[in-house]
């Protein structure tokens, strides 16, 4: 463990922050240049469900489209530089950590971006098509005055970002559980006994983070339960050597 003065810590923090900011600006500029393609990609779930139906995405404010593309570029840039942020955070705090603490932090910062991306991929390819199909079922084209969807460009992006962030954060569940187990705050046996409570909590979280339709809630709750069970298996592997070591010392 290395000891630094406050000024050295502050200088190091500024350098790390500057690197993150520089990376963000560069990636943001690239994303803004390709923002049309990125937005078209996000529209794919809706476009595939529409088939031959002509679908319009509108904007009702003069600056709405511009600021929507700015928001899209910023969000895309942030999701891309998550590993850079994680690396810079690790390099900043690692000199002040013990070896076992470094392993825990490295595990968290390595797995967190991966799980976030897994959640994003899952929601985009599996949840959004089902959710969009549900919402499109409210269209009534055969009525005297047809009811059709003409989504606003900003509202559509806000919903997509909301879902990606919700699933990305929810997929961090294994990290939280495993770290608590490593710190000996939560035991595997406790996780097994509290399964029913975990099921209820997962559905509550899903209800808060997802749109109000039941399909989206189940689409998040079920993966969370699978992640919970996976966490139990991993925690069991972590605890087994620890238990054997205690028994060996007692003998």
Swiss-Prot record:
Q: Which domain of life is it from?
A: Bacteria
Alphabetized PROSITE patterns for the sequence: TATC (PS01218)
The gene that this protein is the product of is: tatC
Q: Which UniProt keywords apply?
A: Cell inner membrane, Cell membrane, Membrane, Protein transport, Translocation, Transmembrane, Transmembrane helix, Transport
Give the protein's biological function.
Part of the twin-arginine translocation (Tat) system that transports large folded proteins containing a characteristic twin-arginine motif in their signal peptide across membranes. Together with TatB, TatC is part of a receptor directly interacting with Tat signal peptides.
UniProt xrefs under Pfam families: TatC
Q: What is the lineage of its organism?
A: Bacteria, Pseudomonadati, Pseudomonadota, Alphaproteobacteria, Rickettsiales
Write out the similarity annotation: Belongs to the TatC family.
Q: Membrane topology for this entry?
A: Multi-pass membrane protein
Q: Which HAMAP family match?
A: TatC (MF_00902)
GO cellular component terms attached to this protein's record: TAT protein transport complex
Assembly, in brief, is:
The Tat system comprises two distinct complexes: a TatABC complex, containing multiple copies of TatA, TatB and TatC subunits, and a separate TatA complex, containing only TatA subunits. Substrates initially bind to the TatABC complex, which probably triggers association of the separate TatA complex to form the active translocon.
> What name has this protein been given in UniProt?
Sec-independent protein translocase protein TatC
Protein transport as UniProt keyword: yes
* TM spans (from-to): 23-43, 73-93, 104-124, 159-179, 197-217, 218-238
User: What InterPro entries does this protein map onto?
Assistant: Sec-indep_translocase_CS, TatC
Per the record, the GO terms for biological process are: intracellular protein transmembrane transport; protein transport by the Tat complex
One of the entry's Gene Ontology molecular-function terms is: proton motive force dependent protein transmembrane transporter activity
Cell compartment(s), UniProt: Cell inner membrane
């Amino acid at each position: 463990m290395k000891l630094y003065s406050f000024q050295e810590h502050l200088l190091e923090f500024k350098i790390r922050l500057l690197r993150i900011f520089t990376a963000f600006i560069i990636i943001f500029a690239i994303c803004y240049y390709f923002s049309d393609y990125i937005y078209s990609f996000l529209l794919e779930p809706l476009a595939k469900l529409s088939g031959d139906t002509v679908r319009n995405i509108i904007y009702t404010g003069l600056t709405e489209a511009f600021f929507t593309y700015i928001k899209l570029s910023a969000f895309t840039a942030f999701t891309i530089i998550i590993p850079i942020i994680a690396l810079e955070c690790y390099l900043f705090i690692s000199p002040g950590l013990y070896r076992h603490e470094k392993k825990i932090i490295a595990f968290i910062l390595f797995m967190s971006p991966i799980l976030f991306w897994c959640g994003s991929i899952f929601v985009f390819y599996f949840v959004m098509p089902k959710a969009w199909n549900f919402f499109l079922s409210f269209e009534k084209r055969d009525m005297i005055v047809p009811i059709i969807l003409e989504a606003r460009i900003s509202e559509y992006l806000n919903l997509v970002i909301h879902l990606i962030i919700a699933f990305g954060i929810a997929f961090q569940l294994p990290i939280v559980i495993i770290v608590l187990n490593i710190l000996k705050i939560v035991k595997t046996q406790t996780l097994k006994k509290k399964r029913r409570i975990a099921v209820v909590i997962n559905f509550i979280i899903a209800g808060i983070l997802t749109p109000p339709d039941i399909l989206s809630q189940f689409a998040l709750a079920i993966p969370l339960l699978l992640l919970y069970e996976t966490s139990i298996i991993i925690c069991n592997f972590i605890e087994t050597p620890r238990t054997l070591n205690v028994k060996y010392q007692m003998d």
